[in-house]
């Protein structure tokens, strides 16, 4: 079930506050966050986020095509190790 349109997209307040402050100052330093659940909004375009994947922070540069997705979608938590190929 999707989120109600009445509520709007979820973005952590501390994250939105940092983005707005950086837009006013016109800074582009990376923003470190654990908030994988936050939705990417149009005002985040052009910013770099360091999103935690459970072990380390992965750098995510936000572009126009990412709007509407969540930050966690661009920071994978699992690494697939391929199965060995049988020779012979």
From Swiss-Prot:
InterPro entries hit by this protein: Ribosomal_uS19 (IPR002222), Ribosomal_uS19_bac-type (IPR005732), Ribosomal_uS19_CS (IPR020934), Ribosomal_uS19_SF (IPR023575)
Domain of life: Bacteria
Function comment: Protein S19 forms a complex with S13 that binds strongly to the 16S ribosomal RNA.
PANTHER family referenced in this protein's UniProt entry, alphabetically: RIBOSOMAL PROTEIN S19P FAMILY MEMBER, SMALL RIBOSOMAL SUBUNIT PROTEIN US19M
Family under the similarity heading: Belongs to the universal ribosomal protein uS19 family.
Protein's UniProt name: Small ribosomal subunit protein uS19
UniProt key word Membrane: no
A GO cellular component entry from the record: cytoplasm
Originating species: Chlamydia pneumoniae (Chlamydophila pneumoniae)
UniProt keyword annotations, A-Z: Ribonucleoprotein, Ribosomal protein, RNA-binding, rRNA-binding
GO MF entries: rRNA binding; structural constituent of ribosome
One BP annotation, GO: ribosomal small subunit assembly
Short name of one Pfam family: Ribosomal_S19
Gene behind the chain: rpsS
């Amino acid at each position: 079930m999707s989120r109600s349109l009445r509520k709007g997209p979820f973005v952590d307040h501390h994250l939105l506050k940092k983005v707005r402050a950086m837009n006013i100052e016109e800074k582009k330093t990376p923003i470190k966050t654990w908030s994988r659940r936050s939705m990417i909004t149009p005002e985040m375009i052009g910013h770099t986020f360091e999103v935690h994947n459970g072990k380390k922070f992965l750098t995510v540069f936000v572009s126009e095509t990412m709007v509407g997705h969540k930050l966690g979608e661009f920071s994978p938590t699992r690494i697939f190790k391929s199965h060995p190929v049988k020779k012979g």
